[in-house]
């Protein structure tokens, strides 16, 4: 499953979003965890947050549920 598919699956179900977070690589801060409720939408290239921040989808390293990794870029490489 691609990162986009996994992000959209979680968004579309809209259940328990507060249990999910996304770990991204920020060019200045390093690894940053973003709570899933902040994500407004996802397209093929970007993640759009509630404060108008736009994050390139290639910066996503992990998706976590209650702190446990459920998707990892390194584990899901093809």
From Swiss-Prot:
Pfam families tied to this protein: MJ1316
InterPro entries, sorted: MJ1316 (IPR040459), UPF0248 (IPR007547)
HAMAP family tied to this protein: UPF0248 (MF_01245)
Family: Belongs to the UPF0248 family.
Name assigned to this protein: UPF0248 protein Msed_0897
């Amino acid at each position: 499953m691609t990162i986009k598919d996994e992000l959209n699956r979680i968004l579309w179900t809209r259940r328990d979003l507060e249990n999910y977070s996304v770990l991204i690589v920020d060019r200045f801060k390093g690894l940053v965890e973003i709570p899933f409720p902040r994500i407004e939408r996802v397209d093929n290239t970007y993640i759009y947050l509630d404060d108008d921040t736009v994050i390139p989808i290639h910066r996503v390293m992990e998706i976590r549920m209650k702190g446990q990794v459920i998707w990892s870029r390194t584990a899901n490489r093809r």
